[in-house]
Amino acid sequence: LSPSSAASDVYKRQAPLALTYKAINTMDSMLGYKNERYLYFGRVPAKLDDVANYIPSRLAGLLWVAAAAFTHNDAKGAWKIWRRDRRRHASPNSAQTESACAGALGVQLAGPAYYFGEYYAKPTIGDPLRPIEPEDILRANRMMYVASAFALAWGVAIRTVL
């Protein structure tokens, strides 16, 4: 096999998986609501999305802890809050990166919210060591970029070995 045909074979195997993942993710976004209209029909894509993102979300949480150290944020705080609060959400995957970010920044995130005009009491994530400020958006973005670079490097390394 030539290098180009070998690469083509890899893409042919991966494309259906990527499309399946995207379909699951989109169905969850559109139908995975816990309201009367979608409660039963939306449960399947919501659970499939939980399964599909179980490992990636945890790896992403760890990458955010590492990114905190490289962006001069509080890596120890990120680790502590990630370990403590990563399960403080109705979805098993949603608080993984959010908790690491909250710990790295020393802020409290989440909490009560309104959806479709209805109040929902939700747990907070992180400790309110200081008030949230606009600069935190830039700090979180930097951590996101560094965590993404780590994930890309990790993927390239795995792909090179395999």
Where are these regions (language model features)?
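Membrane-embedded alpha-helical segments that form the functional core of polytopic membrane enzymes
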Residues: 12-24
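Single conserved hydrophobic/aromatic residue that forms the stacking wall/gate
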Residues: 1-7, 11
